[in-house]
C-alpha cells in the first residue's frame, strides 16, 4: 500500500518519523500520547551489560533531539519531565544544562523535600508519595515524560488531571506494555490505572521488533526470523516481516496487534 509509512532504517529517520507523528497528532487535538521505539541498537538492547543508566542516558539524548524538532515545527515550548530530582540531576549533568536547546527544558515532576510546605508533604516526599508534591511547568506548552516507572505513573496522571488547558503529554519510551503487566501487584498501582489513564494514551509512534522461531518437521527443523510492529500516526499498525533486505508488511490493523502477530 503506497499510503503505508515505511519503517525507519536509521535512528535519525526514527526520530523524524516520531516528530512527524507527534506534530500531526497535536494538530488533531490529541492530548495524551505514547511514543515507543528502541533507544539503542538491538545488540545493545539485548546486552546484559547495558544498564538502566545507559538506557536512561540514551533516552535523554533522544528526547532532547525529539523535543527540538517539536519546538522547530510548532513553536511550542517543551518541558522534559523526570520522576524526581535525582533523575533530573543526572540528566542535567549528562546534557550540561537544564535548558539544553532553545525552547527545551528539563524538570522534575515531583518537587524536592526542601520544597515541602508542611511536615506531611515532607513525609510523603521522602517516599515519593503525595499528589501535592507534583509540580506543573507553567511556561511549557508540551510535556514529555521520561524514565517513569509503574509506581511513578500516578504522578503523570495527576499532572494530566490538573492541566485545565490540557497541554499535550507525551509518554516517551516508557515501555508501557511491560508496565501495564505490573499493575495490581504488591507495591504497584492498582489495575484501574490502566482504565482511568493509560488506556487514553494514543500510540502515535510505535516500533517494536521481536525474534521468532519456527519449528519444522524436516531439515532445517528450526527457522529463526524477525518481525516488527510499526505505527506512525495517523496510519494503521503494521505487522512487518524482516526479509533480510527490508521489512515486508504482512497485515495492517487500526488497533495494535499482539506481539505474536507473526507466529506461524
Residue ranges of predicted features:
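Ser/Thr/Gly-rich flexible loops in soluble cytosolic domains mediating phosphotransfer, phosphorylation
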Residues: 147-153, 160-204
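A conserved mid-domain beta-alpha-beta active-site/ligand-binding segment of alpha/beta enzyme cores
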Residues: 181-259
Amino acid at each position: 500500500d503506497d499510503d503505508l509509512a515505511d519503517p525507519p532504517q536509521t535512528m535519525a529517520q526514527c526520530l523524524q518519523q516520531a516528530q512527524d507523528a507527534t506534530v500531526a497528532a497535536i494538530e488533531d487535538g490529541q492530548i495524551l500520547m505514547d511514543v515507543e521505539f528502541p533507544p539503542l541498537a538491538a545488540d545493545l538492547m539485548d546486552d546484559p551489560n547495558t544498564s538502566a543508566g545507559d538506557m536512561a542516558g540514551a533516552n535523554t539524548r533522544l528526547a532532547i533531539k525529539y523535543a527540538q524538532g517539536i519546538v522547530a515545527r510548532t513553536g511550542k515550548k517543551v518541558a522534559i519531565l523526570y520522576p524526581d530530582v535525582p533523575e533530573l540531576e543526572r540528566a542535567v549533568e549528562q546534557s550540561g544544562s537544564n535548558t539544553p536547546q532553545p525552547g527545551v527544558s528539563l524538570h522534575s515532576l515531583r518537587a524536592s523535600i526542601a520544597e515541602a510546605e508542611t511536615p506531611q508533604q515532607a513525609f510523603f516526599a521522602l517516599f515519593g508519595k503525595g499528589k501535592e508534591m507534583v509540580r506543573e511547568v507553567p511556561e511549557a506548552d508540551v510535556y514529555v515524560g521520561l524514565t517513569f516507572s509503574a509506581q511513578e505513573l500516578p504522578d503523570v496522571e495527576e499532572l494530566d488531571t490538573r492541566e485545565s488547558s490540557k497541554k499535550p503529554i507525551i509518554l516517551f519510551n516508557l515501555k508501557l506494555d511491560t508496565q501495564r503487566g505490573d499493575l495490581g501487584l504488591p507495591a504497584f498501582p492498582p489495575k484501574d490505572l490502566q482504565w482511568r489513564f493509560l488506556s487514553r494514551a494514543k500510540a502515535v509512534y510505535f516500533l517494536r521488533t521481536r525474534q521468532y522461531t519456527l519449528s519444522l518437521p524436516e531439515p532445517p527443523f528450526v527457522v529463526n526470523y524477525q518481525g516488527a510492529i510499526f505505527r506512525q500516526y495517523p496510519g494503521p499498525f503494521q505487522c512487518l516481516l524482516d526479509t533480510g533486505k527490508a521489512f515486508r508488511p504482512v497485515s495492517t490493523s487500526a488497533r495494535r496487534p499482539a506481539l505474536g502477530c507473526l507466529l506461524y
